[in-house]
């Protein structure tokens, strides 16, 4: 994973080139820049825009390569198991009959084609969803303002910006009014920076150029017009994205599948060679030994594994899409179900991301309507873009009928807000006595700087150091409750002038406070409880102050005994942090690298971590997390780094996604454990039979047909239900767990087969003189028992009574059982299969074996669960 400082180091040379280029452009006049880009204030024409779009490409900073059907078709046949089947078919063609070769090829082709259709279906589905996720911007073309998609912006476009706008490209400003831009995606600093339509400095960093706005930034307040000077990968953001775009580590699911594949290939080679040697030495027929070993190899190969896995993942992708979740990497669905720690910010996830006025109080802590009135006048008469604080004051004032007070005053002037003073003032004249008043609101420390008096206990007093301490203590009381505290001051003006400036903000009287809360989302408390109930610990990683973070945690019921600050983390060793991340649920004043370190340490502690973020600075944590989660309003780089994109920023959506991830995992693990234990049991039985029987227990062609019919019975597994109890705990991929289950159930299956062999030989007389009857009998018994036992393996509960399979799986399994009974009858006259018609009493014996098998499996299930804590 590339760290941000490494990214900046790598692009330092290009960064300097771009800095020099933009610095030169920034020093040019508006007319010179318009001429250089062959444009005007009326914008370029549509024809010119089309030409430039073809020349420069779309205005995007992440690659979206289109993939053809041929790509997916070729990729489907690249699967290891498909390749093994094809190789076995080729060998079989030269050593045996054509029919068995066609059966092997048929299995391989059908599996590959199903995977092709499923993979291509997911790709098309995701492309359609991505097409619906776009951002627009306002440009002037041919003298007319219009709204276009950001990817269609070209150099020379004239762009209009206002509060809330995303900067759609790298832009040089040609006009601005009180413009403040948030550049935290590059700098990590949340404080907006003022931008003006003329160069005011010799910048040392590209984002410090005063009249250049960079793609990926956003407008906090004010308005502006600019000329697009770079788009796409030539922008600063685009150059960064080339370095941030790195191949993500394989998910636990991908690692697990690779391990299983390697294990099965080794197992197939060892068993096939063993069968070949044993059969060859005992029978002295080495050609038949090769054919039989090849058939065993095919039987061991879970040919439907790619299809079952992909159908499961595809179905999960489509289900999540309906729940407002876009899955970019389908293999991350299983990881989503495995999450046991979720790291997220509080703003917009736990809260509504809109502030509400809660208090208007004096220094004594008493409600004072005059404070609300002063704040209302300040916000109402301010001509700049109304920020969240202004809107909250006006909305609350209207509800309290304070708005009538504006009729008593006439606005004279204002001193706009800026991020140096962190305050804003308006001067009004009373319509009753013509007296002038200045009302100022802003950050507590900045308001105190311009005050010499304070209203306290109903009287105006000198603002002594002792009084400052009282004021600060009262403000802290509300800050501890998680409130944003804004200070209010006023003074009377007697100069009789109508123009005021910053120097007039002096000798003021401190009046009191207005306090705000970003309220918790209504469903967050219940959703956090649900997440906890399914084994997920939620941890807050925020850049906000610890008071606000702890308050919102109290409101939503998030348990926390200690809050860790970013500065605390910097002082800790990895060993100390490893302990703290287990104990602490709230991390405040965090920068991106500190967040990444916490996520990394949680992973090192053995957790499966989900990380939710939406900025460029979140990309390191999104990359390193087991599941990176972003939102559709996030920066392009954040969305590219994420595995999953939410169309709605909500913990409820994540909760539903986790459950779906566990359903997907549950159905995949069902198939894995069923198929592998069945294959292992069959092979174990074959080895035993090869030693003691004077003939093959199954012919190669019968074995291939049996394997094919068994696979068909499991096609509906992706649509099966999963027990509620299974969804209550995180599910980690465990190759050892699969291997252990395979051994236990495989041996159990072989015990039933041995009973069947004894019954066929001694009860029915299917001995050397009736080997075709023996082979037919085992073909039917083995396939029926393997198919029926699906219902016992799929749940930790009692099948048919406490847990029932989905109707499609039920139809599939019972359909296969009926097909199995009919197969010897229908293929009796085809010599290649060597099937016989079995007597009715044989099926009574099979029913007895099934009863014994069922009871045995239920006993083993209880013992296995008691010892291992789980069944699937």
Label each residue range with its predicted role.
Residues 776-872:
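C-terminal transmembrane module of polytopic membrane proteins
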Residues 525-527, 533, 545-556, 593-601, ...:
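Acidic, divalent-metal-coordinating active-site segment for phosphoryl/phosphodiester hydrolysis
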Residues 1-145, 151-154, 159-160, 164-167, ...:
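Non-lumenal N-terminal regulatory segments of integral membrane proteins
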Residues 271, 275, 306, 556, ...:
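Membrane-embedded transport module
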Residues 58-90, 123, 145-146, 203-212, ...:
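Soluble-to-membrane junctions at the N-terminal ends of transmembrane alpha-helices
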Residues 53, 212-220, 335-510, 516, ...:
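Cytosolic catalytic regions of ATP/NTP-dependent phosphoryl-transfer enzymes
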Residues 83-103, 263-301, 314, 318-324, ...:
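Helix-interface capping motifs at the ends of transmembrane segments in multi-pass membrane proteins
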Residues 92, 102-134, 141, 251-344, ...:
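Hydrophobic alpha-helical transmembrane segments
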């Amino acid at each position: 994973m590339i760290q941000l400082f490494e990214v900046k180091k790598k692009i330092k040379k290009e960064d300097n080139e771009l800095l020099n280029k933009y610095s030169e452009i920034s020093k040019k006049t508006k007319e010179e820049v318009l001429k250089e880009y062959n444009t005007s204030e009326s914008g370029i024409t549509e024809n010119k825009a089309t030409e430039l779009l073809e020349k420069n490409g779309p205005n995007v900073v992440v690659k979206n390569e289109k993939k053809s059907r041929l790509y997916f078709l070729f990729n489907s046949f690249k699967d290891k198991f498909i390749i093994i089947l094809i190789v076995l078919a080729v060998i079989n063609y030269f050593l045996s009959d054509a029919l068995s070769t066609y059966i092997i090829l048929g299995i391989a082709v059908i599996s590959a084609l199903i995977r092709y259709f499923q993979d291509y279906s997911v790709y098309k589905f995701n492309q359609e969803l991505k097409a619906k996720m776009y951002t627009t911007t306002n440009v002037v073309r041919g003298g007319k303002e219009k709204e276009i998609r950001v990817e269609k912006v070209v150099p020379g476009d004239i762009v209009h910006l206002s509060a809330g706008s995303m900067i759609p490209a790298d832009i040089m400003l040609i006009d601005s009014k009180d413009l403040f831009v948030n550049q935290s995606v590059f700098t990590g600093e949340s404080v907006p920076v003022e931008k003006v339509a003329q160069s005011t400095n010799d910048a040392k960093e590209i984002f410090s150029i005063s009249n250049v706005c960079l793609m990926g930034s956003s407008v906090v307040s004010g308005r502006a017009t600019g000329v697009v000077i770079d788009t796409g990968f030539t922008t600063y953001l685009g150059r960064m994205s080339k370095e941030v775009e790195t191949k993500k580590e394989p998910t636990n699911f991908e690692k697990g599948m690779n391990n299983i594949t390697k294990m099965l290939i080794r197992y197939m080679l060892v068993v096939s060679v063993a069968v070949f040697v044993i059969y060859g030495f005992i029978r002295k027929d080495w050609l038949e030994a090769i054919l039989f070993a090849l058939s065993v190899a095919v039987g061991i190969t879970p040919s439907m594994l790619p299809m079952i896995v992909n159908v499961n993942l595809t179905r999960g992708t489509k289900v999540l899409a309906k729940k407002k979740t876009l899955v970019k990497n389908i293999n991350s669905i299983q990881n989503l179900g495995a999450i046991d720690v979720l790291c997220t910010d509080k703003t917009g996830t736990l809260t509504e991301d809109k502030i509400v006025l809660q208090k208007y109080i004096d220094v004594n802590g008493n409600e004072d309507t005059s404070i609300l009135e002063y704040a209302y006048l300040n916000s109402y008469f301010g001509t700049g873009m109304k920020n969240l604080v202004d809107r909250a004051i006006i909305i609350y004032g209207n509800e309290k009928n304070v708005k009538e007070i504006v009729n008593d005053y006439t606005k004279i002037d204002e001193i706009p807000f800026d991020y140096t003073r962190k305050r804003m003032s308006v001067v009004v004249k009373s319509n009753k006595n013509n007296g002038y008043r200045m009302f100022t609101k802003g950050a507590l420390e900045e308001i105190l700087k311009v005050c010499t008096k304070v209203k306290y206990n109903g009287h105006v007093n000198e603002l002594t150091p002792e009084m400052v301490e009282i004021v600060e203590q009262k403000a802290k009381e509300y800050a501890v409750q998680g409130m944003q505290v804004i200070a209010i001051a006023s003074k009377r003006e007697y100069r009789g002038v109508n123009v005021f400036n910053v120097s007039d903000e002096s000798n003021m009287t401190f009046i009191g406070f207005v306090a705000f809360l970003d309220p918790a989302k209504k469903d967050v408390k219940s959703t956090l409880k649900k997440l906890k109930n399914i084994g997920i610990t939620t941890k807050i990683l925020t850049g906000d102050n610890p008071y606000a973070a702890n308050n919102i945690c109290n409101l939503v019921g998030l348990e926390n005994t200690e809050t860790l600050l970013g500065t605390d983390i910097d002082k800790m060793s990895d060993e100390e942090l490893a302990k703290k991340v287990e104990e602490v649920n709230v991390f405040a004043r965090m920068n991106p690298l500190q967040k990444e370190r916490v996520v990394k340490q949680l992973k090192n502690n053995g957790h499966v971590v989900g990380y939710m973020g939406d900025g460029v600075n979140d990309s390191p944590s999104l990359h390193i997390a087991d599941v990176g989660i972003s939102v559709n309003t996030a920066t392009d780089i954040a969305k590219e780094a994420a595995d999953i994109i939410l169309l709605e920023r909500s913990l409820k959506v994540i909760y539903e996604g986790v459950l779906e991830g566990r359903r997907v995992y549950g159905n995949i693990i069902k198939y894995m454990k069923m198929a592998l234990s069945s294959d292992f049991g069959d092979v174990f039985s074959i080895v035993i039979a090869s030693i003691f029987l004077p003939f093959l227990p199954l012919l190669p062609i019968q074995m291939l047909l049996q394997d094919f019919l068994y696979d068909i019975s499991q096609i509906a597994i992706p649509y099966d239900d999963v027990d509620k109890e299974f969804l209550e705990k995180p599910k980690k991929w465990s190759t050892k767990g699969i291997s252990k289950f395979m051994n236990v159930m495989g041996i159990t299956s072989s015990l039933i087969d041995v009973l069947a062999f004894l019954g066929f030989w001694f009860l029915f007389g299917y001995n050397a003189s009736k080997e075709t009857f023996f082979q037919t009998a085992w073909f039917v018994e083995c396939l029926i028992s393997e198919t029926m036992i699906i219902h016992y393996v799929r749940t930790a509960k009692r099948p048919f009574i406490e847990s029932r399979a989905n109707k499609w799986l039920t139809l599939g399994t019972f359909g296969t059982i009926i097909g199995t009974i009919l197969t010897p009858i229908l293929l009796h006259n085809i010599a290649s299969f060597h099937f016989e018609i079995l007597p009715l009493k044989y099926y009574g014996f099979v029913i007895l074996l099934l009863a014994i098998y069922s009871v045995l499996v239920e006993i083993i299930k209880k013992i296995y669960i008691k010892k291992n804590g789980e069944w699937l």
